[in-house]
Structures are given as C-alpha cells and as structure tokens.
Amino acid sequence: METVVVMVAGLVDHDVAVRVWRDRPGSVLVRHVAAETCVRRWVDGVATDIDLLHGCASCTVREDLRELLAALKGHTVVLHLDPLLEPDAVRRKLGVDVECVITVLDAATWLDDALGDASMVSDQRTVAQVVVAQAEAADVLVLQGDADERTLAVLDRLAPGAHRCTPETVVVRKSTRPRLMPLTPECGVSTAVFTADRPFHPARLNDALDSLLDGTVVRSRGRLWVADEPDVALHLESAGCGLHVGEGGPLGGRTTQIVAITLGEPDSITAAFTEALLTDDELSFVDSIRKLAI
C-alpha cells in the first residue's frame, strides 16, 4: 500500500492542515518548524526537537521527512510545510508522489507581496519568489479573506485549473490537467508571450530584463538563446522584483520563448526583448566568425 502525501503550504498562519487531518480519519499530521539551534517536529501533536544537521535547517527537515515517510509507508500523511518552503522544491528533493498540494494565502495582501521586492530574513529569496512559487504549485488555493477581481485574474493565470475555496470549505482535490493559461486580458492582467528564432545580444538582453522588474510582473519564465552561449540555453525565472537567470541545459532548437504574467503593458515587454535581439548585420558577423572557427 502506497503512502499518500498531502502538502499544505503558505506563508500565512492558518489551521488548514489541521482541518484536512481531521477530515481524513487515520491520517498522520506532520509539521516542522525551524528554530535557531534545532528543528521542532510535530507528529499528530507530539513534539520532538531534532538537532540541526551541519547547521542547516532545510537539510534537517529533508532528511527527517525521508525517514518519517519511510516509517509511515501505507498511511496518509498531511504534511504542514514550514512557511518558507516551496512545495515543488520539497517534492523534487524527497522524490515522493503527492496527491494534492494545498496553498493558503492572504487574499488581501498576496498580490502586493507577489509584486514586491521585500527580502526574506532567512535566506536570499524575496517574499515574492516564495508566495508565487507556493501559489503556482497548488492544486487547491485556500483564500483567507476576500480577493479582488485582479488578484483572482492573476491566480487564474498563475495556477490555472486550481480549485479555490476558503479554510472552512477546504477539500483535497487534484487539479485538472492540462493547465492552460488564459491569454485574454482580464481586469488589467495580461499574458505577454515572446518568441524569437535569433539570439540575444548579451548586453542588450541585460537591459531588456529590466522590463520584468518594474513592479508590474508577477511571474515570468523563459528559455533564452544568447549569442555568446551558442550551445547552452539559459533559464529565466522572475517573481515580483526578484529574478534569476542560470544555465538551462543544451540549447537544442535555436529559439527563445518567454511568458510573463503582467499588470502592465505586455507590448512593452515584447518590445524590450525584440530590441535586444541581434540585428541582421550582427547575426551575419557572428555566423562568419563561427565559420572561421570551424
């Protein structure tokens, strides 16, 4: 009999994990909270302090969860994640099948957090990177308080197919697949889509990235072809005013694709990245250099 895992995430205080646990007789409620010198773990309300491994709270939680899930094989485990943890990151590191990811958010403040540049106290991430990653991983979004239409339109694009409910009506439900992001503008929320079949100029690309950091973009993702990296694609990801660009594996097809959820003008984003592409003269020069190298 396989272990069933339900993850409950969220940066806000909530009792949703307890509600899910109570609604599933025989399930086990697990929660970890990091402290300065240890990690406190609760299993069905019984607390245990665990010494930090190498001074790393996340490493300690990960290793303890591996052992716990092995010991609880065949059970339903309701995993109340530490507020700072992102469900997809936990799922990848643990290598477990998850029946449902439930994310709890403050409907009144979530969008401001998702657009902002506030930093987390505990690590190098921004608050936006945490709350956006938690929301987009959700099969079920639990809204504490009333959300305005603009927030709901953003969530429709960030987590399409996710079921929305309140803490009192929470259910464990796998979202429908495939998740198709709406492309039609709604309540001032748009989806910018940029594609190109020529590489970026590295310096101009750096300038174009600023179009994603003006406080109107909730989330962007992309796979970039840059002229000085002819064999490697770069992976782009931003949330609010936090951005990361890193190696994304072999280039494969020589194309660029960027998708951004924005409350601003999508045309300004596509225009900025269009201006960052190599011109015809630059492209001819690069091609001639490559031929000489061969």
Q: Which residues are covered by each model-predicted region?
A:
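Nucleotide-state-sensitive switch-loop elements of NTP-binding domains
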Residues: 2-102, 107-112, 120
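Generic C-terminus detector
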Residues: 252-294
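C-terminal accessory "lid"/substrate-recognition subdomains
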Residues: 25, 34-38, 103, 107-112, ...
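Short, flexible beta-strand-to-coil junctions
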Residues: 10-12, 224-226, 263-265
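Short, solvent-exposed amphipathic alpha-helical segments in soluble enzyme
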Residues: 20-24, 44-45, 94, 156-158, ...
